[in-house]
Amino acid sequence: MNVKIRNEIQALIRIQERNNNGGELREFICAREVDGYGEKTYLITFDHYSICARYCGESISRAIASGDAFNVDLWEYVMDREYICASDPEAREMWQRIWRDYRLMAKGWARCCYSSLALKAVQLSLRHIPASLREPLLY
């Protein structure tokens, strides 16, 4: 089996497992303009206690658009939570695992080549955002 496909399958399985854990954790990806430097993609995770974010990939031109789902105040809070979590060894380890999975997907997006597995992972993630808060995918 092609190594790229195998890695994507493994990442997708891990994403599915995390998203099927009874509501404790939900992940999705959001694209947003950052300080005029172009579109950046972030992984946003909601759980019962905190909101965290991680940067993912390089200036991705056609990733995911979620409209105005996040305002500036919320985004600043998200980044504050990320800073707090970075000082927690357990949280840092969790983020490293999650980060590895999404970077596999981000590599394909950065080259504008979307495999079917990457698209499935995106769809899996986006199902957790209410339709009223997102716009159609821009591919």
From Swiss-Prot:
Q: Which UniProt keywords apply?
A: Early protein, Host cytoplasm
Query: Where is it located?
Result: Host cytoplasm
> What is expression of this protein induced or repressed by?
Expressed in the early phase of the viral replicative cycle. Expression of early genes is repressed by viral Repc (latency) and favored by viral Ner protein.
Please tell me where this protein is predominantly located. Answer: host cell
Domain of life per record: Viruses
Recorded GO CC terms: host cell cytoplasm
Q: What is this protein called?
A: Uncharacterized protein gp8
Q: Which organism is it from?
A: Escherichia phage Mu
Q: Lineage of the native species?
A: Viruses, Duplodnaviria, Heunggongvirae, Uroviricota, Caudoviricetes
